[in-house]
Amino acid sequence: MLDGASTAPSEAERCIIAMMLMQIALDTHDEVTDDGGDLRARQLVVLAGDLYSGLYYELLARSGETALIRSFAEAVRDINEQKVRLYEKKVERIESLFAAVGTIESALLVKLADRMAAPQWGQFAYSYLLMRRLLLEQEAFIRTGASVLFEQMAQIAFPRAKTLTKEQKRHLLRFCRRYIDGCREALFAAKLPVNGLLQLRVAELSGGFQAIAKKTVEEG
């Protein structure tokens, strides 16, 4: 994304650091639970998240990046709105559920891509991060039978079922895999100038890691 951006390297680096600080702040606040644990520990986690958020704001404010502050604020608003929808289980369609997850995972990167005048990279990030999250949830569901995402999928698809049958589980897995395949196709169709590391990440995520490793050994 940075190779094709018209932004100066130092400016681009500052924007990326700010985005990472904001993401850390969000992730830190997500660790706060209401399970009745130690109150002081929870307060410290909140303060840690606020610290990262403050560092992000200070970095951009000092450099006069008010437009990016607004953009990231919009992303945080969208992320939090979708988190609330998921938490309160207000999503009525599985397609909307996956769209909410995609927004939560990628909204900050999408805004950064817009700032770099490279919206195609925002679309790439959306597909990549959504696929990664779906694969993690799918693995958890297959391995342990427990997945927050699949639990909500089940409530949408089979609202009256107290316990899922094998066929119902297979139905949910097929639906998830269809979306994973869609994300994979979007990544390969993008044809963006990705570097070697990102190529490896995408290949590994999409199931092509073993083929690449074998080819590397054969050619090496």
From Swiss-Prot:
Listed EC numbers: 2.5.1.30
A Pfam family annotated for this UniProt entry: HEPPP_synt_1
Recorded catalytic activity of this chain's protein: 4 isopentenyl diphosphate + (2E,6E)-farnesyl diphosphate = all-trans-heptaprenyl diphosphate + 4 diphosphate
GO BP annotations listed: isoprenoid biosynthetic process; menaquinone biosynthetic process
Record keywords, A-Z: Isoprene biosynthesis, Transferase
Top EC class, one word: transferase
Superkingdom of this protein's organism: Bacteria
Gene Ontology molecular function: heptaprenyl diphosphate synthase activity; transferase activity, transferring alkyl or aryl (other than methyl) groups
InterPro entries: HEPPP_synth_su1
Subunit structure: Heterodimer of component I and II.
Chain's role: Supplies heptaprenyl diphosphate, the precursor for the side chain of the isoprenoid quinone menaquinone-7 (MQ-7).
Name this polypeptide is given: Heptaprenyl diphosphate synthase component 1
Organism: Geobacillus stearothermophilus
Origin organism lineage: Bacteria, Bacillati, Bacillota, Bacilli, Bacillales
